[in-house]
Amino acid sequence: MATVLASGVSADADERGLERRLEPRHEQKTTIAVFGDWPYNLNLLNNANLLLDSVNSDPEVSLVMHVGDIHSGSMPCTSAGTLPPIAASNPGWNQQIFAAFQKFKSPVVYTPGDNEWTDCHKSKESSSGKPLQELAAVRSLFFARPGWTLGLHDMEVYSQAKYFSPSYPADAQFVENMIWMDARTVFVTVNMPGSDNDGLPWSSVEDKTAREAEIAARTDADIRWLQAAFNLAEREHAAAVVIGLQADMWDPAALAAGGDGLDRYTGFVRELANQAVRFRRPVLLINGDSHLYGSDRPLADPSSATGKIHNAAAAANLTRITVQGSTNAPGEWLRLTIDARTPSVFSWKNVAYCVDPLTSCK
């Protein structure tokens, strides 16, 4: 029987749901490696050891986080669940990425991106998969052990598959959503892909009823999981909260003519803002999706360009980092240090491992 996390139901029920406490591995300070939108071509995959060696050789890295997109938006999906397999598909790609993840010495947390499921219907991905079938395949491979990370040395975490609200038993399907605590910081991942949160029609396999149901169920579950993370942070008197997801929910390219739009993120962003305001202490959001490294405070000023997009509450304590990804040079991973003894808690730098992902890494 699944253990339930009664987030938003009652404090007593929430306590019972998390009565089996997962002990943090570090009391005050830890360092993690974060990257996403990788590998975006065969050059990066063939040179995966450069990334692996760079991360594995850092003695302070205690965890690895991949924020989604395990191939580019012009590479095929796996035609999961389709027989015979779609000719243009690459059925073995996900397994190759899984094998690479397992070579990291530290626990690996991965949250799905749009390219490996949401966008598989697109012609630029060779119409090589049906979104829901591709998501099911991602879950069956990367999340085969609910409540455990990937990596050579795995780690137990809270998974929404086991810790879900009893009022919403269907949330158990979101095995990819995780929570853990380390260095007086609560970490949470949610499945929030690009392409306007799966808001784009599925081309030749479009089923609007199924797509809209998918968006609603997953986004609502993501919000409940986010609430659960902040509830845990309050109860444990955490110094900070870190959220990992794929989508750049303020991407200006998505708002430009012909862009994907950003409206399907608004409900989640508003809840994130509300939770950050209530929490008061530092909150860090890490995303990929738009590929170029940057950091900002997108909700600090409601009258700013980013503040106007979702009309959310002002949350000056929310910092956002977009990790370097795709084939942008140089190939980098983010070295994020969390030190609960410092006022800002977070510090980071980029570590290069590939000179030019498009041509030669060395």
Where are these regions (language model features)?
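Conserved beta-sheet core of the metallophosphoesterase superfamily
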Residues: 261-344
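Structural recognition of the beta-strand scaffold that forms the well-ordered cores
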Residues: 31-36, 62-72, 102, 107-112, ...
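Extended active-site neighborhood of metal-dependent phosphoesterases/phosphodiesterases
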Residues: 81-218, 300-337
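N-terminal active-site segment of His-dependent metallophosphoesterases
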Residues: 14-90, 238
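A short C-terminal boundary segment appended to hydrolase-like catalytic domains
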Residues: 26, 332-362
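Bacterial N-terminal signal peptides
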Residues: 1-4
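His/acidic metal-ligating clusters that form di-metal
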Residues: 54-63, 181, 186-188, 204-299
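Active-site environment of divalent metal-dependent phosphoester hydrolases
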Residues: 41-42, 72-75, 112-121, 195-200, ...
